[in-house]
A protein has these predicted regions:
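Metal-dependent enolase-superfamily TIM-barrel catalytic cores that perform enediolate-based chemistry
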Residues: 6, 10-127
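Shared catalytic-loop signature of beta/alpha-barrel
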Residues: 99, 105, 114-235, 239
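Conserved, mostly hydrophobic/aromatic
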Residues: 39, 84, 109, 147, ...
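N-terminal amphipathic alpha-helix/helix-capping segment at the start of soluble metabolic enzymes
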Residues: 1-7, 229, 236
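Structural signal for hydrophobic packing residues in well-ordered secondary-structure cores
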Residues: 72-75, 105, 201-205, 257-260
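Catalytic cores of large soluble enzymes that bind and process phosphate-bearing ligands
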Residues: 19, 59-63, 164, 189, ...
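C-terminal extensions of enzymes
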Residues: 219, 224-265
Length: 265
């Protein structure tokens, strides 16, 4: 596409050091001081992985709400905040959460319930004063169309590596635009997918923000790039280089392919 311009990004993984005992509120302040203007995190991360949606207690919902309030108080009103609930709630608990966080002006609440149940998701969307978002598990425009036509969310989150590439993601964006729905691509993966997602966001009118893990991934993810697209403050500069604007160092890639271990954040 080769467009010029800038794509705004929201930061994920800024909170990762809480596993080492760091304070979430302090980490939010640090991320903002380093240039982030939009932050996303997982306020129900404390729940056991096996806990079922219907087992979540009101006190656990309140704990998550209190965390949102604390982060908002720390970063002020001008920073966009988003939360990913990772499908941990049923409709009643999700409605309770969305109502209670309304005063804190979240940009969106991601996957509050199982997205496969469109009846529940669209019903929650009608109740919620906060935009809902989903899409990272959907593959192709047909699956997105079902969500979009039901007005089940205010923001869709296609992943360029899951939906089938740039062309398919742009078609999904067109469908969303018809219904007044924004696009905030899911992007926890590597530099090539990031570059592709940036190009799509630069080419569509309903791009909201692009997810980035730029501050929380192993360096090995970028070591095979001879020309890379790096986060600059709160976004990516599209630039004028041909293609995706990045180049792979094939020798480095072959070397890294022999190293064992995980490149996951």
């Amino acid at each position: 596409m080769g467009l010029t311009g800038r794509v705004r990004a929201y930061l994920n993984q800024w909170w990762r050091d809480i596993a080492k005992g760091a304070d979430l509120v302090d980490l939010a302040r640090i991320a903002v001081s380093e240039g982030a203007t939009a932050l996303k995190w997982y306020p129900f991360r404390f729940l056991p992985q096996h806990e079922q949606n219907w087992a979540v207690r009101p006190i656990e919902v309140q704990r998550a709400v209190d965390e949102v309030a604390a982060v908002r108080a720390a970063v002020g009103p001008n920073i966009d905040l988003m939360v990913d609930l990772w499908r941990r709630l049923d409709r009643a608990a999700a409605a309770q959460f969305c109502m209670q966080v309304a005063p804190y002006n979240l940009r969106f609440v991601e996957e509050p319930v199982m997205a496969e149940n469109l009846e529940v998701l669209s019903g929650l969307a009608r109740q919620s004063p906060v935009r809902l978002a989903t899409g990272e598990r959907l593959a192709g425009r047909q699956e997105f169309l079902a969500v979009i036509e039901r007005q089940a969310v205010g923001i869709v989150q296609p992943s360029v590596i899951r939906v089938g590439g740039i062309t398919e993601m742009r078609k999904i964006a067109v469908l969303a635009e018809i219904y007044g729905i924004g696009v905030a691509p899911h992007n926890p993966v590597g530099p090539i997918a990031t570059a592709a997602s940036v190009q799509v966001c630069a080419a569509i009118p309903n791009a909201v923000m692009l997810e980035t893990y730029a501050n929380g991934v192993p360096a090995v993810r970028d070591e095979f790039m001879s020309v890379n697209l790096l986060l600059d403050g709160d976004g990516f500069n599209v630039g004028t280089r041909p293609g995706l604007g990045v180049e792979v160092d094939e020798k480095a890639l072959k070397r890294l392919a022999t190293i064992s271990g995980s490149a996951r954040p």
